[in-house]
Amino acid sequence: MSANQEEDKKPGDGGAHINLKVKGQDGNEVFFRIKRSTQLKKLMNAYCDRQSVDMNSIAFLFDGRRLRAEQTPDELDMEDGDEIDAMLHQTGGSGGGATA
């Protein structure tokens, strides 16, 4: 076992890590392993860095509900192997319909 793996295994932290899959609109899947107590913004930032997109242009959804960056897997009762959807924000339209 490497020193890195030993750091992840602490006595009494049974199941402190969780494996999550982030699936993009294009079907691309990225896998992450984070602590259950880690805020999801860490995962969101890592996903956006890998995809070279701005975090503000992506909506992350779990069970159809939008995720907030400060939430944790524990708060959301996420289980190992759960899937998060990463959807590109739809922007556009007439620009707000300004009136004179």
From Swiss-Prot:
Additional free-text comment from the UniProt record: Stress conditions rapidly and substantially elevates the amount of SUMO1 and SUMO2 conjugates with a concomitant reduction in the amount of free SUMO proteins. The SUMO conjugation system plays an important function in stress protection and/or repair.
Glycyl lysine isopeptide (Gly-Lys) (interchain with K-? in acceptor proteins) cross-link, chain position(s): 93
SMART domains in alphabetical order: UBQ
Keywords noted in UniProt: Cytoplasm, Isopeptide bond, Nucleus, Ubl conjugation pathway
CC terms in the record's Gene Ontology section: cytoplasm; cytosol; nucleus
GO BP, one annotated term: negative regulation of DNA-binding transcription factor activity
UniProt cross-references to InterPro entries, sorted A to Z: Rad60/SUMO-like_dom, Ubiquitin-like_dom, Ubiquitin-like_domsf
Pfam families: Rad60-SLD
GO molecular function (one): protein tag activity
Subunit structure and binding partners: Interacts with SAE2, SCE1, SIZ1 and MMS21. Interacts with HSFA2. Covalently attached to ABI5, FLD, GTE3, HSFA2 and ICE1.
Name by which UniProt lists this protein: Small ubiquitin-related modifier 1
